[in-house]
């Protein structure tokens, strides 16, 4: 059927040509699309429109600045709220801030940075002044240099106000640059220098400015470049910036081991505030046996001797105290050493004080003990003895290295002389391999071993018998025959019971009574020990010969019966094998 015959009249043909689904309809017959020239092109505003003059949207920037008033907001039912793209104008003419005000109106068509940075178009400083983004981006290199010079002058003024020497200030900033952001930026509550000083007066905590205030006229602006200039200061000495400075000779720093423990700790509460405290260990936590905050399990052994001295050794790492010089070996093991303490007191350290470390070091062996749970008592004791052996060697090394540091470390973890335990290992436990079991049989308890030995005979007989073992075959194959009314192993099917009983009765009838008497009544009943004289012995021998002759005659008569029993046993074995093959 052709198209001409498809239409009944001309009106149907017109509808066909005006249809949007007709590909043969011309552009003149189609309805004109809705004009979108009043809608600004978002791609042109961002500089990414590729349509050019053929774009159906408007490329006029003036139209983009003039926002259409939201009619829904005037009615009170705009569901977009502050995200609405139209202007929200109140009845009195005031405009409510919406997304329409986010882009800058002055630099609208040329830059796409203003659109992408609309939520952060303005920067609010500490004195609540709105600074445009362009003022920060238009700073030249010369202005940066002048700013750094001004900040360097401010640094010198700040150093005069701080109670510590200038060399310590440089070292402290290098210290903060080498560690993991120990000093962070001061919050809004400490934004002004006056508030920082008031805070230090109230709490008695020494404060170090995290970054410096750069003064520009009457207003103060916090500049992050001061922190950069401080961290960029290079230390010429590769060993330690504290050597030869006033840091070691200053009276504000301790010169005793105990005072040194209370001087370098930076409490976690001061993180994020730029405040450094003087306490490395809290005395309350030391009395309670708590773990120091900056010591971990792997690092405590290497840092323990270093805390006993009041100097910093020459290493490239400024952020961590290191090991102190070793104690000369000429010091006797039984001699005590005296060190100056706090307020004129004297610290006396003897090798016996190292016993406080035994509970500390025994904690390091807890995972080994836990891993040995569930094993035999012998292996558990060997693990425990091995851990105590390592404890003894560890403490002996610490004793030869620095006896004072080890005793102080033990006292800081809450151990005392009274609570110490002496883990002396006897010589009989020198060979730990003797406690390793050779087989699983040694791991059984005495009750389990006795129970297993009591079932030994049954295990042998049951293992030698088949799963489909019958009464007769179990009596023939087993070393310990059982009566016919009991089973040795899993019994066979019930259809063989009558078969076995019938052939058993036939075999008993065919066997002479003398053979049954010999088999059921052994010669042990007439042993010579029950007789009193030689006459009885001779009579017994005669009876034995008589029995022997009777047995020979009865065996010849019973050949036929034994052949019948053997044939039945062969048949039984074949049927049992067939049962096993089917299973």
UniProtKB/Swiss-Prot annotation:
Subcellular location per the Swiss-Prot or TrEMBL entry: Cytoplasm
GO MF term set: ubiquitin protein ligase activity; zinc ion binding
Gene3D superfamilies in UniProt: 2.30.30.1190, Zinc finger, CCCH-type (4.10.1000.10)
Top-rank lineage group of the source organism: Eukaryota
Polar residues composition-biased segments: 323-334, 475-490, 513-532
Cellular component, GO annotation: cytosol; nucleus
Entry protein name: Protein cps3
Primary location class: cytoplasm
ZnF endpoints (C3H1-type): 35-62, 64-91
Job of this protein: Responsible for supersensitivity to the spindle poison, isopropyl N-3-chlorophenyl carbamate. Has a role in meiosis.
PROSITE patterns in alphabetical order: ZF_C3H1
Pfam family, one: zf-CCCH_4
Keyword Nucleotide-binding carried by entry: no
Keyword Cytoplasm among record annotations: yes
Biological process (GO), any one: protein polyubiquitination
Primary gene name: cps3
Alphabetical UniProt keywords: Cytoplasm, Meiosis, Metal-binding, Repeat, Zinc, Zinc-finger
């Amino acid at each position: 059927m052709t198209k001409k015959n498809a239409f009944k009249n001309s009106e149907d043909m017109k509808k066909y040509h005006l249809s949007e689904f007709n590909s043969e309809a011309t552009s003149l017959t189609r309805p004109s699309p809705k004009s979108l020239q009043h809608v600004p092109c978002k791609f042109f505003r961002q500089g990414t429109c590729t349509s050019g003059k053929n774009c159906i949207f408007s490329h006029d920037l003036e139209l983009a600045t003039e926002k259409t008033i939201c009619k829904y907001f005037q009615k009170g039912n705009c569901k977009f709220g502050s995200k609405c793209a139209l202007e929200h104008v109140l009845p009195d003419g005031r405009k409510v801030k919406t997304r329409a005000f986010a882009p800058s109106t002055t630099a609208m068509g040329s830059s796409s940075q203003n659109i992408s940075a609309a939520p952060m178009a303005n920067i609010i400083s500490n004195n609540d002044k709105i600074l445009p983004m362009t003022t920060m981006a238009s700073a030249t290199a010369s202005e940066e240099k002048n700013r750094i010079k001004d900040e360097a002058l401010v640094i010198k003024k700040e150093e005069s106000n701080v109670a510590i020497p200038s060399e310590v200030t440089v070292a402290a900033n290098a210290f903060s640059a080498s560690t993991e952001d120990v000093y962070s930026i001061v919050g809004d509550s400490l934004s002004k220098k006056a508030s920082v000083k008031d805070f230090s007066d109230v709490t008695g905590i020494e404060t170090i400015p995290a970054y410096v205030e750069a003064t520009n006229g009457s207003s103060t602006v916090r500049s992050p470049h001061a922190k950069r200039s401080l961290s960029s200061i290079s230390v010429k000495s590769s060993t330690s910036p504290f050597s030869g400075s006033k840091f070691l000779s200053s009276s504000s720093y301790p010169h005793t081991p105990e005072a040194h423990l209370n001087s370098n700790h930076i409490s976690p509460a001061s993180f994020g505030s730029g405040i450094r405290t003087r306490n490395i260990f809290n005395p309350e936590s030391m009395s309670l046996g708590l773990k120091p905050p900056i010591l971990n399990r792997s690092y405590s052994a290497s840092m323990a001797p270093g805390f006993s001295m009041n100097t910093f050794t020459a290493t490239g790492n400024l952020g961590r105290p290191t090991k102190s010089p070793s104690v000369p070996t000429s010091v006797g093991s039984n001699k005590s050493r005296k060190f100056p303490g706090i307020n004129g007191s004297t610290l006396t350290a003897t090798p016996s004080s190292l016993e406080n470390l035994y509970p500390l070091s025994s904690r390091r062996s807890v995972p080994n003990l836990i891993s040995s749970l569930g094993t035999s008592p012998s292996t558990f004791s060997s693990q425990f003895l091995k851990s105590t052996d390592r404890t003894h060697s560890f403490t002996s090394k610490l004793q030869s290295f620095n006896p004072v540091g080890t005793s102080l470390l033990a006292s800081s973890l809450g151990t005392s002389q009274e609570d110490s335990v002496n883990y002396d290992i006897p010589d009989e436990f020198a060979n730990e391999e003797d406690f390793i079991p050779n087989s699983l049989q040694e791991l059984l308890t005495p009750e389990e071993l006795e129970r297993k030995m009591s079932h030994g005979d049954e295990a042998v007989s049951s293992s030698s018998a088949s799963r489909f073992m019958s009464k007769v075959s179990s009596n023939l194959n087993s070393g310990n025959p059982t009566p016919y009314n009991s089973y040795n192993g899993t019994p066979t099917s019930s259809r063989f019971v009558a078969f076995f009983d019938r052939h058993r009765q036939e075999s008993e009838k065919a066997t002479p009574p003398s053979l049954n008497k010999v088999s059921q009544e052994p010669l042990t009943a007439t042993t010579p020990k029950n007789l009193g004289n030689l006459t009885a012995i001779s009579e017994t021998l005669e009876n034995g010969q008589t029995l022997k002759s009777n047995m020979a005659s009865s065996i010849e008569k019973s050949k036929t019966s034994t052949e019948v029993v053997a044939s039945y046993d062969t048949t039984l074995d074949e049927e049992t094998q067939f049962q096993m093959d089917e299973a």
